[in-house]
Structures are given as structure tokens and as C-alpha cells.
Design a protein with these regions (language model features):
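Short acidic/glycine-rich loop or secondary-structure boundary segments that cap or lie
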Residues: 210-212, 262-265
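Thiamine diphosphate
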Residues: 1-241, 245-251
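A short alpha/beta connector and helix-capping loop motif
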Residues: 84, 93-96, 263-282
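Active-site metal-binding loops of divalent metal-dependent hydrolases
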Residues: 257-259
Length: 282
């Protein structure tokens, strides 16, 4: 395993001091390290992976320096448009490094929503014409150096693939404060306790879906009117809106996440335009 301090020093040695992207569990330790060292680097948390490509393009255009975009491979699809129509060497030729966490790696146990992208990620990068390195402990320093040089020389994005367990443990120093005094799980329980059993419920990606499912089980309730959006982060609100429009006689509750909502905020305008009165967005 590689320490977060070690890889940070390698980036620094190669003149890389700009990082932007969307958090990923495989990269969690390293991202926590980046956040703790924001006074020494430039760090932008992007709304989605496509926006992160835009951030790093703006950084390069204004500084002539290569930056890093980090993401989970499930978010690669969000980045394909700007990668092919903006950063590609046949368009503007913007050098950058893509640091991609490899969920759903073939042969490894992972959640169902990660299996397809885990299988097709490397072939997809090949089709996109994006060179890549699968980082390993022994060659990491040389791999990053070569990737940066290749990106600059060929005016192209280059990907650094990170497998699960690549980073050693790191405990974040910065802690988030308790703003509302009500945790996510308590909020879900409070709302569910008001249900009469006839509602349709949509829950967004991640822990919200998991916590709703666990609470249903703990109370001996059925899941037949729940839809757990295990993937497709940011699209639960579109799913819930359309269900509400098609089933106006039903109350439709959406448990959404702040990060998921920010990822595709434009859907809020669509919801506002069609304004289904039976949709409750929480």
C-alpha cells in the first residue's frame, strides 16, 4: 500500500498542485489528505465529473499547468462528453491526469451497480483514446512522472487507475460540524413513521437507500413500493418526478442527498415546470 503523504510528494515533485473531482470510496484516504492540505495546494470539489473536467481545463488554460481530476469509474460516463469534445487531442488538446477509482474490478466482489463499468472501463478508455496506467506500489512514482510527461507531450488526458486497497489508512484532521442536530438516519425514520403504507418511495444512491431498507426491515415493513436507486447518482429526482406525473393519485416521496442533487441540479427546473403536487422531495 502507498501512503497518502508519499503520493502527494510525488505529485508535488512533478509540479502537480491542482486537484478537482467527485469523492470516491477507493480514493477516500487520499482525498481526505488533499482536503487537510488545501492551504498548500488548489482543491476544487466539483458538482459532477464533467464539471471537474471543465475546472481542470480552465486551470490549464490560465496557468499552462497539468491538473488532476479524481473520480470513481462509475462517474466516467459523466466526463465522456467534455473529454471527447473539449479535452481530446483532436479538439483543444488539454493535458490532464484522471485519477480513477476502480469499482467493480473483474474477479473482485462488489455491488451489482459497479459490475458493468468495472468490466468495460479499460476498453472504454481504449475507445476514447485515453492512455492509462494501473498504479502499483513499486512503480507508482515513475508511473505518475511518465503519465504527466505523456499528457504534456501528446496534449491528451492520461488516466491513473487505482485499485481498492491501494492507499494505506489516513484519518482526516478536518471534521464537519453538526449543523442541524438531526442526522440523516433520524430524518428518514421521522418521515417514514408518518407513512400509512400506500406511498411510493424513491431513495437516492448510497447510504440513504441502505438506511431506508434497513429501517423497513427493522419494522417488519414491505419494500414493494420502494425503489432504491443504487447507481446513477443524481438521477433519483428525475425518476421520482416521472413516477409522480404518471401516478397522480399516489403520494410519491423522494429521499435525496445533497451531493446527488447538486450533481444534476438542472432537473429541479424540470420538476418546477411540471410541478407534480403529489411529489414530496426530501
Amino acid at each position: 500500500m502507498i501512503s497518502c503523504e508519499n503520493i502527494h510528494e510525488v505529485f508535488k515533485k512533478n509540479g502537480i498542485e491542482y486537484f478537482t473531482g467527485v469523492p470516491d470510496s477507493i480514493l477516500k484516504e487520499w482525498i481526505n489528505y488533499v482536503v487537510d492540505n488545501e492551504d498548500k495546494i488548489v482543491h476544487r470539489i466539483a458538482a459532477n465529473e464533467g464539471a471537474a473536467i471543465g475546472h481542470v481545463v480552465g486551470y490549464y488554460l490560465s496557468t499552462d499547468k497539468v491538473g488532476v481530476v479524481y473520480m470513481q469509474n462509475s462517474g466516467l460516463g459523466n466526463a465522456v462528453n467534455p473529454l471527447t469534445s473539449l479535452a481530446d487531442s483532436d479538439v483543444f488538446g488539454i493535458p490532464m491526469l484522471l485519477m480513477i477509482g476502480w469499482r467493480g474490478e473483474p474477479g473482485k466482489n462488489d455491488a451489482p451497480q459497479h459490475k458493468k463499468m468495472g468490466k468495460v472501463m479499460l476498453p472504454l478508455l481504449d475507445v476514447l483514446g485515453i492512455p492509462y496506467e494501473i498504479l502499483n506500489d513499486e512503480d507508482m512514482s515513475e508511473q505518475i512522472k511518465n503519465a504527466k510527461e505523456k499528457a504534456k507531450k501528446e496534449d491528451t488526458p492520461v488516466a491513473l487507475i487505482v485499485k481498492k486497497g491501494f492507499f494505506s489508512g489516513y484519518i482526516a484532521k478536518k471534521k464537519e460540524g453538526d449543523i442541524l442536530g438531526l442526522c440523516r438516519e433520524e430524518a428518514i425514520h421521522t418521515v417514514v413513521d408518518t407513512f400509512n403504507g400506500d406511498e411510493i418511495v424513491v431513495a437516492t444512491t448510497g447510504k440513504i437507500s441502505r438506511e431506508l431498507s434497513e429501517y423497513r426491515q427493522a419494522r417488519g415493513q414491505k419494500h414493494d413500493k420502494d425503489f432504491y436507486v443504487v447507481g446513477s447518482m443524481g438521477h433519483a429526482c428525475a425518476i421520482a418526478m416521472e413516477i409522480a406525473c404518471q401516478r397522480p393519485e399516489k403520494k410519491v416521496y423522494l429521499f435525496d442527498g445533497d451531493g446527488a442533487l447538486m450533481m444534476h441540479t438542472g432537473t429541479m427546473a424540470t420538476i418546477g415546470y411540471y410541478a407534480p403536487e403529489n411529489l414530496f422531495h426530501i
